[in-house]
UniProtKB/Swiss-Prot annotation:
NCBIfam families assigned to the protein according to its UniProt record, in alphabetical order: polynuc_phos, PRK11824.1
Lineage: superkingdom: Bacteria
Molecular-function GO term, any one: 3'-5'-RNA exonuclease activity
UniProt-listed InterPro entries: ExoRNase_PH_dom1 (IPR001247), ExoRNase_PH_dom2 (IPR015847), ExoRNase_PH_dom2_sf (IPR036345), KH_dom (IPR004087), KH_dom_type_1 (IPR004088), KH_dom_type_1_sf (IPR036612), NA-bd_OB-fold (IPR012340), PNPase (IPR012162)
Name of protein: Polyribonucleotide nucleotidyltransferase
Stored CDD domains: KH-I_PNPase (cd02393), RNase_PH_PNPase_1 (cd11363), RNase_PH_PNPase_2 (cd11364), S1_PNPase (cd04472)
Organism of origin: Pectobacterium atrosepticum (strain SCRI 1043 / ATCC BAA-672)
Gene (name only): pnp
SUPFAM superfamilies for the chain: Eukaryotic type KH-domain (KH-domain type I) (SSF54791), Nucleic acid-binding proteins (SSF50249), Polynucleotide phosphorylase/guanosine pentaphosphate synthase (PNPase/GPSI), domain 3 (SSF46915), Ribonuclease PH domain 2-like (SSF55666), Ribosomal protein S5 domain 2-like (SSF54211)
GO biological process, one term: mRNA catabolic process
Complex formation: Component of the RNA degradosome, which is a multiprotein complex involved in RNA processing and mRNA degradation.
Binding site for Mg(2+): 486, 492
Family label: Belongs to the polyribonucleotide nucleotidyltransferase family.
Top-level EC class as recorded in UniProt: transferase
Amino acid sequence: MLNPIVRKFQYGQHTVTLETGMMARQATAAVMVSMDDTAVFVTVVGAKNAKPGQSFFPLTVNYQERTYAAGRFPGGFFRREGRPSEGETLTSRLIDRPIRPLFPEGFLNEVQVIATVVSVNPQVSPDIVAMIGASAALSLSGIPFSGPIGVARVGYLNDQYVLNPTTDELKESRLDLVVAGTQGAVLMVESEAELLSEDQMLGAVVFGHEQQQIVIENINSLVAEAGKPKWEWHAPAVNVSLEQRVQALSEARLGDAYRITEKQERYAQVNVIKTDVVAALQAEDETLNAGEIQEILGNIEKNVVRGRVLAGEPRIDGREKDMIRGLDVRTGVLPRTHGSALFTRGETQALVTATLGTERDAQNIDELTGERTDRFLLHYNFPPYCVGETGMVGSPKRREIGHGRLAKRGVLAVMPKANEFPYTVRVVSEITESNGSSSMASVCGASLALMDAGVPIKSAVAGIAMGLVKEGDNFVVLSDILGDEDHLGDMDFKVAGSREGITALQMDIKIEGITREIMQVALNQAKGARLHILGVMEQAISTPRGDISEFAPRIHTIKISTDKIKDVIGKGGSVIRALTEETGTTIEIEDDGTVRIASTDGEKAKHAIRRIEEITAEIEVGRVYQGKVTRIVDFGAFVAIGGGKEGLVHISQIADKRVEKVTDYLQMGQEVPVKVLEVDRQGRVRLSIKEANPQTQEAAAPSSEE
């Protein structure tokens, strides 16, 4: 019999329901989590044993949205969900980051978390619901896991923090921050902000962590009622004798290797040491496992680097804890791009370009709650050559999507509004060298490339990655971390912003016990680093260029009456298509009558504007127009005037004498002058050829002598 176990609790303005025991009973654990009609079904399956020879922890997290959740059909030919969208990939990473550090060291059994959105309320984002579900399912499963975690979204409205704001509230909020953590520690922060101060950001993190305790309490209550027995798992026994032998052979040599400041040379030396140690030990005892020796060597490396930092000695590359690597900033490095920059910080380098386009270049994004368009795109590419390796080149991986989104968050707050700058903007960051903090190099490069392209951003932005080494109460915060310091440290803390405030904050913490004091030190140290980088960037380019590139499309904006929109578009789009072909421009019309004409050639744009003005001009009675015959009928001819408007020339108005047959005087496509006699209430236009012809008028005029 199905026997569901349910917990309900109030979480801010929402009601959260946790339910287990009803579905997917063959999974290790399964939970249905709902928050005001947004429901996510989360399952966890863990392998009872690790695969032979497994050397890493194979955790996979898959977040998937089903269109039926919103009562919609999937797009595409097959009408079925396909590969994960960018949003699904980002949410998968968001779930993965806070849970990964909570599995014990040495646990190598395969674990898969699948979160499926099965119902969606447009006002409640499913990502927070999915994270709560993953925490609950892992806690119920019995798999070794130091959870549960809580999670909260924090907004900032009217100078007040808002817990789990609705979608509408987020549009007005100056902050969108997601914080996850255990009962005693923050583990992950992901946020974008509109130039908030360090204190405001830290306050949001602390607020979110305090508020999410109710989630942890309710998951613990659910586990007490429905949790499965804890697995009998023990960490592999430590081979103390082998550790001592490895240490004796390698510690001093690794210490010398980590004084080599150049990355490739250091890596080469470390690899030689590791190969020598494995060979020496296996020569003594060929039954020894090379993987076990490599793992011990990795721990010795970690201890060497961390010990030096905590002792106040210089870092791997010789810097002090708060020093930034050497900077080289160049703009306008590519001749035909609309904007470009080369940003180099030590051994990390990004070639960044900015491209301007029209509204039709904007990305159409099909989300669960409907379609939206994105006018600012930022893409991050991390090719294998940037770290001196070979590898597959193809579609972006999860990491590239995540880093691109972080860089975009860093720049978004300073981008101009559509009514100020009606262009779609695409920024691409090509990482050409990498030794730590390439996403923050992308923020700096994006700011420079946008200024070089003439995009009127509100201010320059820069990004910096901070690290942490902590043992007991002793801790050191590191500015501008290297790749090794990221790998061997306890925290990766990325901050982007301008001189006025923070635009993005991302934090991943590998240990418990990160206090408010440590976060405060890190934020303040990051501010100093950010201001230093901005100072160097401003020497290269301090304000956006006064004009856009000659190779970029220029957008000219005019306004027409809304009742004239149909005239410019024409039947089935015939008029606007003809205009586009005739003028060689791109023309876009909005519902309020705003017309945007884009062209790299100023004369073509002027021609398009002139033609649109002709089409939308009011027909004046008594005025003579040049028209073209479009249809011939027995009682006269229809003539197109004023860009698509048609009027009738009655047979009696063709000539000053009796006309028996219209085709004796007019042919299809013939251009003739016509005078407007009348526009009736229904908008029908009556025309005359004979009154438009000066000779006819002179002949018909009475003599002045009479």
